[in-house]
């Protein structure tokens, strides 16, 4: 797709309080999965706020936001960059997007997540998506195809198979073989 930077944002660094038994300091679901995929904040990649500042300065032509609310920066960013927003909820950042793609919430799509201990668990769709909302993976496929690229997979099972083939932490796993 010609993407030069992928950033999951500074939220991955946001930590809360923890105990020695059950409560983890990391309050982000699936941050371990992001780390396994190499998407954790790292040297040479703009952090969340730095990406926003670069967009406000006109240094980014396109900004793809998945679920991130730009808040007070939304209008300034939208004035300088094409903002493609993939969001499940209405907020200032979503409404300021040049192109807004309605994303289903987690309960409206199949998939998996990796907990802080590395256990990969399956998530099953519990509800049908509202209105024209689509699962995030479907929106990503449509976006890739609209840019002239063939989507590498068409279902959560196929996506997970690709993940298992390319990421050592998921080798030998299959979506159907995961526990809930």
Show the residue positions of the predicted features.
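Non-catalytic alpha/beta scaffold blocks inside enzyme catalytic domains
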Residues: 1-176
């Amino acid at each position: 797709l010609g993407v030069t930077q992928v950033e999951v944002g500074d939220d991955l660094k946001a930590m809360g309080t923890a105990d020695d038994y059950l409560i983890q300091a990391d309050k982000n679901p699936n941050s371990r999965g992001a780390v396994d995929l190499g998407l954790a904040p790292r040297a040479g990649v703009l952090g969340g706020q730095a990406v926003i500042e670069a967009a406000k300065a006109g240094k980014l032509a396109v900004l793809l936001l998945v679920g991130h609310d730009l808040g007070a920066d939304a209008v300034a960013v939208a004035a300088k960059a094409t903002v493609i927003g993939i969001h499940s909820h209405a907020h200032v950042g979503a409404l300021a997007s040049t192109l807004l793609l309605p994303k289903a919430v987690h309960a409206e799509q199949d998939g998996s997540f990796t907990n802080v201990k590395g256990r990969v668990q399956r998530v099953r769709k519990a509800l049908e998506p509202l209105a024209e909302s689509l699962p995030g993976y479907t929106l990503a496929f449509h976006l890739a195809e609209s840019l002239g690229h063939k989507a590498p997979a068409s279902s959560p099972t196929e996506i997970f198979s690709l993940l298992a083939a390319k990421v050592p932490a998921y080798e030998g796993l299959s979506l159907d073989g995961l526990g809930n």
